[in-house]
């Protein structure tokens, strides 16, 4: 049985030039490299110094199009996952569309699902392709979380970084088996009863400010390992594969303890778990596409590899995707 798949044909990423180490943070809050490293696995993160979410997205998009061998005019849709847009309106996607020079009529929208945002955006673009409404989409996860972090709060300011990752997906005919190239399965979830556990307290209709990230760290950690593992298991089940078939798992890069916890819960060897939190920090919606692009560019991820993507974020939202590169 033939059916339409969404094949990942281009990858791109962009990081701000400024790097902030744990030792740098120890100069402004009561912390240390040892304290941060042992609790989070983070050593350094990139922090924007004038670069906007739109700037990072644009650069990542250009790289993704180049690796795909495509131009902006080939795109039918741009979807950006972010909680730190340049403006309240219009969307970052529309801004990128204008800068790239896409054709008139290209669908543009942003989505706010926090750290799960890229999985949400990828799922929506994949569904549009599978329904035959579009053929090619640019899916971006991008954040400048440094702009919504309280730099006097050592519990949160040490965690986050800025960056962007982008993927070009394109319709391709498959045979309807797990041997197909492309997105084989996706699954999304949310549970709004945990709304207050991870929140940026600010907004247009409340405070007229952007606010700062606040978090119940213990609650998030407790929920995250189970949610990330559940999403991974479910997409494997949907596609009819087992953990032994999987080449890589790429969890949202929030915290090394969570990442390791997911690997152990799924009984996957450490060498199959992709980790980039050490030099990125938590980049929210950018973490998965950023790691995908870096690892593909480095030759670690190869065509034909079967990869599980899984993420959880504020809301709570969470989700997974199974992709054969």
Go through each PLM region and give its residues:
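Acidic, glycine-rich active-site loops and adjacent beta-strand->loop/helix elements
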Residues: 14, 81-86, 113-118, 141-146, ...
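Active-site pocket-lining segment
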Residues: 224-229, 243, 247-266
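Flexible, glycine-rich active-site loops centered on histidine and acidic residues
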Residues: 130-163
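Phosphate/pyrophosphate-binding loops at sites that engage ATP/ADP/AMP, CoA/4′-phosphopantetheine
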Residues: 30, 60-76, 176, 230-247, ...
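Condensing-enzyme catalytic core mediating Claisen C-C bond formation in acyl metabolism
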Residues: 1-50, 153-222, 226, 230, ...
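Conserved catalytic cysteine-centered active-site region
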Residues: 35-39, 43-55, 83-137, 264-291
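Catalytic phosphate/nucleotide-handling subdomain of diverse soluble enzymes
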Residues: 290-310, 316-325
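Buried hydrophobic positions in well-ordered alpha/beta secondary-structure cores of metabolic enzymes
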Residues: 8-10, 36, 64, 75-78, ...
